[in-house]
């Protein structure tokens, strides 16, 4: 349906990262290969907070499959990291990273849904903080 409707963007990501749930992931990979998709978002692989060892190895396994799939596309094969902007600000610089931001409007100001909403930090401030690290 997607292709018949004329859509041309052949990149997959998902709300709430459901594409890394194994039951969805295993079916989705067949769809991606068989219908000409070019890339899929990585599972979050850099976090400033601790995650369980099981979750860590699971994400490594999933990302290994996603790196392999994405290696076919000139743009997405370069992406090595997927992380939140707070992780990016706290940790060392990462080349070739996709940074997750969830824009929302709060009191007329565009910010990130994970930002401290009492700090009046707008999305431009967040982007400027990130660009200072480059």
Roles of regions detected by a PLM:
Residues 1-11, 21-134:
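Terminal accessory/targeting
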Residues 15-19:
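Short, internal active-site loops enriched in acidic
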């Amino acid at each position: 349906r997607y292709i018949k409707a004329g859509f041309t963007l052949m990149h997959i990501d998902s709300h709430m990262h459901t594409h890394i749930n194994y039951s969805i992931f295993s079916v989705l990979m067949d769809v991606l290969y068989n219908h000409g998709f070019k890339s899929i978002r990585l599972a979050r692989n850099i976090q400033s907070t601790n995650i369980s060892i099981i979750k860590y190895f699971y994400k490594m396994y999933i990302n290994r499959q996603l790196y392999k799939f994405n290696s076919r596309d000139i743009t997405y094969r370069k992406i090595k990291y997927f992380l939140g902007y707070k992780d990016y600000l706290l940790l060392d610089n990462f080349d070739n990273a996709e940074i997750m931001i969830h824009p929302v409007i709060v009191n007329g100001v565009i910010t990130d849904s994970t930002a401290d909403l009492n700090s009046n930090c707008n999305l431009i401030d967040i982007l400027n903080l990130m660009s200072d690290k480059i």
